[in-house]
A protein has these predicted regions:
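A conserved regulatory-domain signal marking ACT and ACT-like small-molecule sensing domains
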Residues: 318-529
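Rossmann-like adenosine-cofactor binding region
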Residues: 57-62, 174-269
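Glycine-rich Rossmann-fold phosphate-binding loop(s) that bind the pyrophosphate
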Residues: 151-152
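Phosphate-binding beta-alpha-beta segment of Rossmann-like dinucleotide-binding domains, i.e.
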Residues: 89, 97-145, 157-160, 164-165, ...
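Short beta->alpha connector loops at strand-helix junctions that form conserved
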Residues: 31-32, 52, 74-75, 90-102, ...
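Rossmann-like dinucleotide-binding domain for NAD(H)/NADP(H)
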Residues: 89, 93-94, 226-344, 361, ...
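Oxidoreductase and adenylate-handling cofactor-binding alpha/beta cores
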Residues: 105-124, 144, 163-167, 295-308, ...
Length: 529
């Protein structure tokens, strides 16, 4: 019996379809070509959608996809997926960059050779019955300096291959320290040095506000005369109009593009330049790559739907596979603390302050914050909030979220503190994990306690007077509620005190009403963790 339906669009390789079919729990629905109108009609029944680059997964489509849980992009680029809208709708977006790494790197190398030796132009004239040997004199790559901008999977593979060919490779990546000693022997430099020293420059960065028009008239002016440029990453990183002028002037001796700012593009004036070569976005277009990315993304989607396992996510703060088991106790602690504190509060939520201390800072805190916010918002929104859209939903509802990191506190190697403020009250709870890996609440509203939060609990505050606990026990006994554990805290003798009682069975509202009638009881409520 199939539990999930997944739409496969844009000609996804059949190898991926087989991956989904093999689960026996997912029905793959394949539409290599489908009209927009038809897609908007059928997407409402889909739990997952897998696309290549043609289908626009935009706000309109997402608004029609009532039960959509995940969008998979077979490949790297997600220009056709509205990440912001997907996040707002609580839809996970993932891609499969690894499957096309080798193929795209090889395509870049092919373009590099073609650019250096004028291969496409020479081929074209020969097919036009011209033997123009002297016209297409090229340059050697050996000994030349290649500047690689972006050292992700593809950029690193291009750099490795070009080193093996005898090129001097220098690289710039905004996320790698220029002083880093890389095992590959790559020389890390600033982007300005790449501009000044490289004979060839290839870009391998995503298209963002920071990288758009990264190479423009100003940066080209800093380059060597006769520099050659390659873009097999995303259109728009190299300004096409500025490149056109640089080719005409001879400042840039040649350029090779596999991508354009607008695609498909057969009318670009760049295509009229003799020293410009291009391919129609073929970087990942090999039999092997299409099969691999199809298998990868379908496996990722299946694992998410069937096992709630996340990898390759683009709008979700995931844990690395090796971190999941190691930090699971912190995930458990965060979940229980949030579940506990939200049941203490009344009124409309206004702000959430989360403080992480000590060892917990070693993990992905965005992931923990999403877990905490989901638990805090769930009682109000029910099915409307998940780990993917929790931060967005909080912001949308005007809830201020503050996250801070501090060193380890005295007596605790790790500590998570959540302070929840509403329009009527404020509560703060802190918890830790000891060597036994069990989550413990160690402070509630400034009162020191030590309790493993689990199951049914009664939380009450009282004036610290004799007889309160005895009367409480009597009422619970009369109502057949068995106490499994009791944890007390007080500010001073005779002052305010609080208690947490772990009980073996659910507590009815009428029992709590009786407890509230006890002399010196200030407040009482049931909490279930």
């Amino acid at each position: 019996m199939s539990y999930f339906k997944v739409l496969l669009l844009d000609g996804i390789d059949p190898a991926g379809v087989e991956v989904l079919q093999s689960t026996n729990s997912i029905t793959p629905i394949v539409h290599d070509k489908i009209s927009r109108e038809k897609l908007l009609e059928i997407v409402s029944e889909a739990d997952g959608v897998i696309v290549r680059s043609a289908t626009a997964v935009d706000r309109e489509l997402l608004s029609k996809a009532a039960q959509l849980k995940v969008v998979g992009r077979a490949g790297v680029g997600i220009d056709n997926v509205d990440l912001e809208a997907a996040t707002e709708h609580g839809v996970l977006v993932m891609n499969s960059p690894g499957g096309s790494t080798t193929t795209t790197a090889e395509h870049t190398i092919a373009m590099l050779f073609s650019l250096a030796r004028n291969i496409p132009q020479a081929c074209q004239t020969l097919k036009s019955h011209k033997w123009e040997k002297s016209k297409f004199k090229g340059v050697e790559l050996t000994g030349k300096t290649l500047g690689v901008i972006g050292l992700g999977r593809i950029g690193s593979e291009v750099a490795r291959k070009c080193q093996a060919m005898g090129m001097n490779v220098i690289a710039y990546d905004p996320f790698i320290n220029p002083d880093a000693n890389l095992s590959s022997g790559l020389v890390m430099v600033g982007v300005e040095q790449v501009f000044r020293e490289a004979d060839f420059i290839t870009v391998h960065v995503p298209l963002t506000d920071e990288t758009r028009n990264l190479i423009n008239t100003a940066s080209i002016a800093k380059m060597r005369d006769g520099v050659r440029l390659l873009n097999c990453a995303r259109g728009g990183i190299i300004n096409e109009n500025d490149l056109l002028e640089a080719l005409k002037s001879g400042k840039v001796a040649g350029a090779a593009f596999d991508v354009f700012e607008t695609e498909p593009n057969t009318e670009s004036p760049l295509l009229q330049q003799d020293h410009f070569i291009a391919t129609p976005h073929l970087g990942a277009s090999t039999v092997e790559a299409q099969r691999k990315v199809s298998e990868d993304i379908c496996r990722q989607v299946a694992d998410f739907l069937l096992k709630n396992t996340v990898y390759g996510a683009l709008n979700f703060p995931q844990l690395d596979p090796g971190q999941v088991e190691h930090y699971q106790h912190f995930v458990d602690l965060a979940t229980r603390l949030a579940t506990f504190v939200v049941q203490l509060a009344d009124g409309r939520m206004q702000s959430v302050s989360i403080r992480y201390s000590g060892e917990v800072n070693d993990m992905n805190l965005n992931y923990l914050t999403s877990i905490i916010l989901r638990r805090l918002l769930a009682p109000v929104l029910r099915e409307g909030v998940n780990l993917i859209n929790a931060v967005h939903v909080a912001k949308q509802r005007g809830i201020k979220v503050e996250e801070t990191r501090v060193p380890a506190q005295e007596n605790f190697t790790n500590l998570i503190t959540i302070e929840l403020k509403t329009d009527t009250d404020s509560h703060r709870v802190s918890g830790t994990v000891f060597t036994d890996k069990l989550p413990r609440i160690v402070n509630v509203d400034g009162y020191s306690v030590e309790v493993v939060p689990r199951g049914n609990m009664i939380f009450f505050t009282n004036t610290d007077k004799p007889g309160v606990i005895g009367k409480m026990g009597t009422i619970l006994g009369q109502c057949n509620v068995n106490i499994a554990g009791m944890y007390l805290g007080r500010e001073r003798q005779g002052g305010k005190a609080l208690a947490l009682l772990l009980v073996d069975n659910p507590v009815r509202q009428e029992v709590i009403d009786q407890v509230r009638q006890i002399d010196n009881i200030l407040s009482a409520r049931v909490i279930r963790v």
